[in-house]
Amino acid sequence: MMASLGGDNSQAEGAEVRHVPVLIAEVIDALKPVSGAVIVDGTFGAGGYTRRILEAGADVIAIDRDPTAIEAGRAMEKQFPGRLDLVESRFSALDEAVSKVKGAGSKVDGVVLDIGVSSMQIDEAERGFSFQKDGPLDMRMSKKGPSAADVVNRLKTGDLARIFNFLGEERHAGRIARMIDKRRTAQPFTRTLDLANAIETLVGRNPKDRIHPATRVFQALRVYVNDELGELARALLAAERILKPGGRLVVVTFHSLEDRMVKRYFADRAGGSAGSRHLPETHVRLPSFTPAVKGAVGPTAEEEERNPRARSAKLRAGIRTENPPLEDDLSLFGLPKLPETNELARS
């Protein structure tokens, strides 16, 4: 599924060592896994968090919608017999995964979510996530649904601009969308470098810029293709339903859109009055979470030096109260209204 920008740095024997778990010490400190506990790793990826949780003595239900990640995790499953359950699924359905493994109505002691694309996926050109390596313009975490090429070549110009603007915070969104529309009529975009080079040619590149001109467009396409913001919103609500009182929800994000969603969620789940200064109070909402850490926790300078991909990482965490879950309300996340990918699939 949506795995980390890090991952496990102890791959199967003979594999290339590429994956470094991000904020691992901070995650374990916030999650506090102990022997006998059951923790859900909703974004298994290369298994960096799962391994540390298992080493701390807790059992893990690990979820990923990428079948490649699940298959790679079989070696770890053998290393920890009876303590690791791998489930191929979207992490928004983590409550269903827990029911499948532990039985209907089962609760868990912790949930960890690492929101972003795995370095394992970025590093494999054939997955189509990277603008630095040539590959098919795909970007799907699984092989289901429309690809990034489908989006680029088939969506209306205005819809593309909105996706680049809202999901990538790209200031040249309109110009890039119009360029794509003009070019795709004669020659559709099918390769990552083709799109990246076209964007760079259009907007130029200042030598002082730290990021490639295509970075935000590629981010927006990946987030849209995989419905990453919707997945995150539904996963947070699902975690609230399956955590025991005292259970911990730990979320690591890598860009501001996701961090704002998590911050807004924990603030909403702190409860309080349902009224406002304009309307009388209707009822008091009892908190479903209390803070496990103060604000957002970022990487140390040493980690940033060791792993540049950790620079933008932020960790937020909450502790489940004894109160019932609050209402499932996706509107609290402020998600932008964008075209449905299933409509694209039917077009």
Swiss-Prot record:
Short name of any one Pfam family annotated for the protein: Methyltransf_5
Keyword field contains RNA-binding: no
Chain residues that bind S-adenosyl-L-methionine: 47-49, 64, 91, 114, 121
Disordered as annotated region, ranges: 291-347
Record keywords: Cytoplasm, Methyltransferase, rRNA processing, S-adenosyl-L-methionine, Transferase
GO biological process, alphabetically ordered: rRNA base methylation
Primary localization class, coarse: cytoplasm
EC number: 2.1.1.199
Catalytic function, reaction form: cytidine(1402) in 16S rRNA + S-adenosyl-L-methionine = N(4)-methylcytidine(1402) in 16S rRNA + S-adenosyl-L-homocysteine + H(+)
Cell location: Cytoplasm
Broad enzyme group: transferase
MF annotations from Gene Ontology: rRNA (cytosine-N4-)-methyltransferase activity
HAMAP family named among the record's database cross-references: 16SrRNA_methyltr_H (MF_01007)
Function: Specifically methylates the N4 position of cytidine in position 1402 (C1402) of 16S rRNA.
PANTHER family per UniProt: 12S RRNA N4-METHYLCYTIDINE METHYLTRANSFERASE (PTHR11265:SF0), S-ADENOSYL-METHYLTRANSFERASE MRAW (PTHR11265)
Family as reported in the entry's similarity comment: Belongs to the methyltransferase superfamily. RsmH family.
Name recorded for this polypeptide: Ribosomal RNA small subunit methyltransferase H
Organism of this sequence: Brucella anthropi (strain ATCC 49188 / DSM 6882 / CCUG 24695 / JCM 21032 / LMG 3331 / NBRC 15819 / NCTC 12168 / Alc 37) (Ochrobactrum anthropi)
